[in-house]
Amino acid sequence: MEQLRGKIMKIRKICLLSLLITLIFGVVSCSDNKYGEYGYRIEEDLTTTNIIDDNYGNFYEIFVRSFYDSDGDGIGDLKGVTKKLDYISELGFTGIWLMPINKSSSYHKYNVDDYYAIDYQYGTMADFEELIAECHKRGIKIIIDLVLNHSGSNNPLFNKAVNARIKYQAGLELSEADEKFKDFYTFFDSSSDIPKGVTAYKAPNASFYYEANFDSSMPELNYDSPYVYEEVRNIMKFYLDKGVDGFRLDAVKYFYYNYHSKNVEVLSKINQMAKEINPKAYIVGECWDSDAVISQYYKSGIDSFFNFPGSVTNPNGYILNGINREGDALNTYYEGMLKNITLAGEYVPAPFIDNHDTVRFTSTRNYRNSKFQYALLSMLNGNTFTYYGDEVGMVGTKEVDQNVRIPILWGEESGDCSLISGVTSHELTRYIYPTVSEQIADEDSFYNFYKKCLLIRNQNPEIARGNIELVTMDRDTDKLLFISKEYNGNKIGIVFNFSPYYDLTIDIKQYGYEEVIGQIVVDNSEKYIGELKDGKIKMPSYSIAIVKWG
């Protein structure tokens, strides 16, 4: 009996020991389910955002003609934009910039024939008012392209000006309207009066010339005339009263051809008039020039100017050339980050990579590089601008403008727009990429990568607004850049692995940071940023970690 009891006790001990071992290793096994090649997989918050109502956001540039066709005529329209506002919002954009929507004789509509009318191809004023209302319901700001340095040659303003000038030259009696319009545009009495570098054309049925630096259909307004300012104020008031949140000003160097100080005076007056109507109106200007010139234009008080030196237009731009370079990639990008801020001074930087006038940046790099470049853009201070279609990897060379204004492929039963006339046959062979619908379903797509970049940006207000300090930089391996950004008493760290091939391990705690709170990884479905058992973090190639300050 004692022997049996002893055997039972022995069996019990073995069972208990076995159970204990099972429990211990079971727990370890469970906890290690999240432990892989890159350490512990961090649980991320993929829903919460912290969006502030200011001018530091993420804008989405839309060429309406090629965006979404709501009525089946092959031409994108305002109702199509309204239909896709949820798509834009879900991506993480906080504002939209509409390329010109006014009545025009061209496909691009930069020659405006009526500043107070919507082009019939795009819809009606009621459609536009609905779009504004629906934007604001979703917390999306809307700015429109305002072309104020020139109008269209079919604009009644130009016709009135030419007729008044003809009467003036003939010595005929001028009406009050004639007096107003005879100097409304920049006219030259003879070809010898045309300044060097300025392009001018003979006015219709007249002996004099008019300035038109872009095309004969785009006569330049004369900002020596007070009546031009009156008209500009009326135009801005018309749209601000309808609820637009501001304007993108086209070609601001051409109010007075390359006369920068005079252009700054014009912009200062335009800005003052807009702010008198709506103090919160946001204005961004197109000054396609160097850092030195753009810095002069900020003296106008305009909120933002596009940072062309950092874009694809600059062969040495810090976003494109901040990767895949030997020895200086980190410094190139870091210095660019700082210059982006100092250039704007007290105003709002407006970094971008490409737009409707440039090659699409995805045409210049491979798939992984292009994704990482957008991640670099999303880490910059200011108000970023993204060109429609970039979020699905659309390509486009600059043989002709039409090549970079091709329709998005939605992958739906309707909505795709027809091609614009003039797209080159070479470009059509490259017009093959997964549709929007396909990319939404693909974890590793451009679409989902852009969405993640914008989510991280929207979760951390410090990214767009914070003061930058360098934590550490490893120039020897050309991999590690670690910076901090502090805003409103809160500080985060941003750790970059610039290597396209190699992992990076770093002890963030030695710099005072606690944990990873967000991550961007180019190869998202295969790799992640993880915490190792020794407290360090391991980052795969082409990745960015947002880390919490201790």
Language-model-derived ranges and their functions:
Residues M1-I8:
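Short, Lys/Arg-enriched N-terminal segments with co-localized hydrophobic residues
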Residues I14-S31:
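Sec-dependent N-terminal signal peptides of Gram-positive bacterial secreted proteins and lipoproteins
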Residues C30-S217, L221-N222, Y227, D241, ...:
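Acidic/aromatic-lined carbohydrate-recognition and catalytic surfaces
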Residues Y35-E44, H150, F158-E176, N234-I235, ...:
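Active-site-proximal helices and loops of the catalytic beta/alpha 8
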Residues K84, D127, L131, V228-Y239, ...:
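Alpha-helical packing segments of well-folded alpha/beta enzyme cores
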Residues T364-T505, G512, M539:
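Loop/helix patches that line or flank the sugar-binding groove of alpha-linked glycan CAZymes
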Residues K509-S525:
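Solvent-exposed beta-hairpin/edge-strand motifs
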Residues G530-G550:
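C-terminal beta-strand-rich structural cap/linker in extracellular carbohydrate-active enzymes
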